[in-house]
Amino acid sequence: MKISVVMATYNGGKYLREQLDTIRLQTQSVDELIICDDCSGDDTVGIAERYISEYGLQESWRVIVNEQNMGYADNFNKVTLMASGDYIFFADQDDLWLPDKVEKMVAVMEEHEDCVVLCTDYEPMYDGIDASHAPRKIMDKMPDNNLLEKITLSPGSVYIGALGCCMCVRRNFYHEISPYWFDGWAQDDRMWRLAQCAEGCYLLHSNLVRHRIHGNNTATYGKYHTVEKRVKLFTAMQNADQAMKKMLEDRGKWKESVMMEKHNRMMEHRIRLIRDRHFAGCIPLLGYLGYYQKVKSYLVEIGIAVKKK
């Protein structure tokens, strides 16, 4: 059994060394760490290379630098495809791993052979006055009680319920789902969704990551209150819906495929409402309320459309 960690970096020098310490000092050692830097303008690459040299990790840890900026999602996909481990852990450049993160997660995946993606809870760590705080409803879903939950595909489970830095994926599954990839699809959303299509998405309710939240995070809370950002989000979700639908059809899961088609149609109605002020779509959207992540979004988006000039 081989364990890989992959990290996509960009201007992450401020916190990188702390994160590398928590990976190096795991109770179950990792066999490989690949860092892929996306043309950072700071000393991220230098910090990583000096760290590897300082601890004599050249045989198992390495740094790759992109010739041109690829963007977060594509860079993460690139580095993950390079990993050779049976289990692949995603690492952000600015978090802290608890010492037994790898040991606990590998033990669960070894015990549950159907688990293709394992997620965990996390503890938020706020950095700076501009850091967005995790909503109470999110924190309430992370009881840190060490219970294992299997995520079953449903209209509500489509919406991502874990962070990429809290995920581990089987390498064979990652390569198996490569045909469903599209440019720009973030690895956390892709793993969460497609693992459910394979009936292998699990969530371990144990805080194994101290997730640093600051103004430069790729994922922040409450940031989709403009038409442009919401349309971009919904369009990406439509692309993900189509990928799920194709995977489900390839596996002969027709009932679930129909569900994803309905989810996709709902997103189209929501886009037309806020982008085109298509208020006639409010009526059919009532039939899709069960597919919303939050029902109050229905009223919020009507308000956005009303205010749009």
Predicted stretch roles:
Residues 12-25:
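Short, well-formed alpha-helical segments that are part of the catalytic scaffolds
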Residues 88:
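Short aromatic/hydrophobic "clamp" motif used to bind/position activated sugar donors
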Residues 2-4, 24-35, 43, 59-62:
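Short loop->beta transition adjacent to catalytic acidic/histidine clusters or analogous donor-positioning motifs
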Residues 81, 143-224:
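Conserved nucleotide-sugar donor-binding catalytic segment
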Residues 153-157, 185-186, 197, 201, ...:
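C-terminal subregions of glycosyltransferases and related glycan-biosynthesis enzymes
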Residues 37-47, 68:
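A conserved acidic beta->alpha catalytic loop
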Residues 57, 74, 104-108, 112-173:
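Flexible acidic/His/Gly-enriched loops in nucleotide-sugar-dependent glycosyltransferase catalytic domains
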Residues 65-83:
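Glycine-rich, basic loop-to-helix element that forms the pyrophosphate-binding segment
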